[in-house]
């Protein structure tokens, strides 16, 4: 005779079919959302629309191993044109780079050039990660291009990761982020700035030299970036301000400081703007 009490215990111990169905449904939903989140995270940090020429880790090694060059310091201006875009190309020779929130004195003859770098809002909030002499002012990886400065040396790169930013905080270096214009010889799929204005960029050549390039006339960001790519620059990041701010001293000592740049010194946000300063070593 079947043991009725044992059968009753087994029936009570089993889960109803509807309970199992709910558990499978919940597990499936969790798995789907987990995969979706993982894919989005991967696309955000890795699938950024352009290939990368130098990883942040390699740039860290390069920056840490840089040695002071021999020879005099100078910024040499050359002019050229490509794809109908007229360019001023500032070649940097053995300069000492720094990032500062104080616009330099143009009477200081050690200053060879300076220009604006990162953007900020009308309320003075920086857009993109910013580190000045080891002090982190802002953490924001929305912009893919970056520039890192340590011991007067400078590198640029393209990455969503902030490894280099953290390294600059630890090493009392400086760092800012900006829009990417060219990455590994490729243009990004789209640009977020529209209209025609005078443009400026910090770019790296195929033989690993850094230059600052400015347009001589108002250009769209796409036309400017395409001209940089066509000219042969491997990587390039945007510099805000164009020719409306900044200063340049020619090798013969002649200073160039436009009326627009002079007017900018009285801007209400003076003291907030981060400046890339290039000095004699």
Question: What positions do the PLM features span?
Answer:
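Short hydrophobic/aromatic beta-strand or adjacent loop that forms the aromatic wall/cage
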Residues: 85-87, 144, 199, 271-275
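Active-site-adjacent helix-turn-beta-strand microarchitecture at beta-sheet edges
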Residues: 115-116, 121-189
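Beta-strand-turn-beta hairpins that frame and shape the catalytic cleft
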Residues: 85-87, 152-153, 205-211
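Broad, structure-driven detector of short, well-ordered beta-strand segments within folded domains
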Residues: 97-99, 145-150, 202, 276
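Zymogen propeptides
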Residues: 1-140, 213
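Conserved, well-ordered active-site substructure
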Residues: 124-141, 192-195, 204, 208-235, ...
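Flexible, glycine-rich surface segments
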Residues: 173-213
């Amino acid at each position: 005779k079947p043991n009725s009490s044992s059968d009753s215990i087994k029936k009570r111990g089993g889960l109803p079919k509807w309970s199992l169905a709910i558990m499978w449904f919940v597990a499936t939903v969790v798995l789907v959302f987990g995969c979706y989140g993982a894919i989005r995270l991967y696309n955000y940090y890795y699938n950024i629309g352009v290939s990368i020429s130098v990883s942040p880790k390699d740039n860290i090694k390069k920056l840490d191993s840089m040695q002071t060059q021999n020879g005099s310091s100078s910024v040499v201006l050359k002019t050229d044109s490509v794809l109908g875009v007229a360019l001023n190309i500032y070649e940097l020779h053995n300069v000492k780079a720094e990032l500062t929130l104080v616009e330099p004195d143009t009477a200081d003859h050690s200053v060879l050039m300076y220009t604006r770098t990162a953007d900020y809002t009308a309320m003075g909030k920086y857009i993109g990660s910013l580190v000045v002499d080891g002090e982190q002012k802002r953490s924001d990886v929305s912009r893919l291009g970056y520039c890192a400065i340590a011991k007067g040396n400078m590198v640029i790169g393209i990455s969503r990761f902030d490894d280099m930013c953290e390294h600059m905080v630890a090493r009392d270096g400086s760092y800012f982020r900006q829009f990417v214009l060219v990455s590994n010889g490729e243009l990004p799929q789209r640009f977020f700035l529209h209209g025609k204005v005078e443009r400026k960029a910090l770019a790296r050549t195929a033989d690993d030299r850094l230059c600052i390039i400015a347009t001589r006339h108002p250009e769209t960001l796409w036309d400017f970036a395409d001209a940089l790519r066509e000219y042969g620059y491997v990587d390039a990041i945007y510099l805000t301000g164009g020719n409306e701010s900044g200063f340049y001293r020619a090798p013969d000592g002649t200073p160039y400081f436009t009326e627009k740049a002079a007017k900018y010194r009285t801007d209400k946000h003076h003291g907030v703007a981060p400046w890339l300063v290039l000095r004699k070593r």
